[in-house]
């Protein structure tokens, strides 16, 4: 099975759930950029302090800072890994790739979890978060598609993209992902 992976997909597609399952089953390091940022901030590392200052101003953490945090995690990693939540844009991907080449850890596969909007909206509303109403969700999906479509094409052109239908049980989706990575 391929060992250096990216997960892409719209909000509600099950990326986090499937990433956790796959990482546990195959001893891959799960790199969720949101979790990594929170861990760096909590540990009060120099990168974490820089991120905290930006976040406390209500601003987005720069691509460069996220890349530095990802590099920090990968530079001593000899096993496999799964990046979840980064890159989200073509600009981020083109910044990430030279770093991975330098570390001699190129991406081996990109899993795109696809799901129709009706199911996505239903899943997200059922989570019960206060900001998950249909209008907000539709906007998030539109932003996702606008930002991520070029990224999907980029990885398709590189021959890395594996598309998995993310409708069904957690188990059946996990099996489909595993098959796509062999």
UniProtKB/Swiss-Prot annotation:
One function term, GO molecular function aspect? adenylate kinase activity
- Which InterPro entries does this one have? Adenylat/UMP-CMP_kin, Adenylat_kinase_CS, P-loop_NTPase
**Where does the record place the region NMP?**
32-61
Keywords noted in UniProt: ATP-binding, Cytoplasm, Kinase, Nucleotide biosynthesis, Nucleotide-binding, Transferase
Q: Where is this region: LID?
A: 126-132
Binding positions for ATP per the UniProt entry: 12-17, 127, 168
- What are the disulfide bonds? none
The biological process GO terms on file are: AMP salvage
Q: Which SUPFAM superfamilies match?
A: P-loop containing nucleoside triphosphate hydrolases
Q: Cellular location of this protein?
A: Cytoplasm
Record's catalysed reaction(s):
AMP + ATP = 2 ADP
**Which of this chain's residues are annotated to bind AMP?**
33, 38, 59-61, 85-88, 92, 129, 140
Q: Gene3D superfamilies under this entry?
A: P-loop containing nucleotide triphosphate hydrolases (3.40.50.300)
**Cellular component, GO, one term:** cytoplasm
Enzyme Commission number(s) from the entry: 2.7.4.3
List the Pfam families.
ADK
Pathways involved? Purine metabolism; AMP biosynthesis via salvage pathway; AMP from ADP: step 1/1
Give yes or no: UniProt keyword Repeat. no
Entry domain remark: Consists of three domains, a large central CORE domain and two small peripheral domains, NMPbind and LID, which undergo movements during catalysis. The LID domain closes over the site of phosphoryl transfer upon ATP binding. Assembling and dissambling the active center during each catalytic cycle provides an effective means to prevent ATP hydrolysis.
Subunit record text? Monomer.
Similarity remark = Belongs to the adenylate kinase family.
Q: Which HAMAP family match?
A: Adenylate_kinase_Adk (MF_00235)
What is the role of the protein in this entry?
Catalyzes the reversible transfer of the terminal phosphate group between ATP and AMP. Plays an important role in cellular energy homeostasis and in adenine nucleotide metabolism.
The name this protein carries in UniProt is: Adenylate kinase
Gene name per UniProt: adk
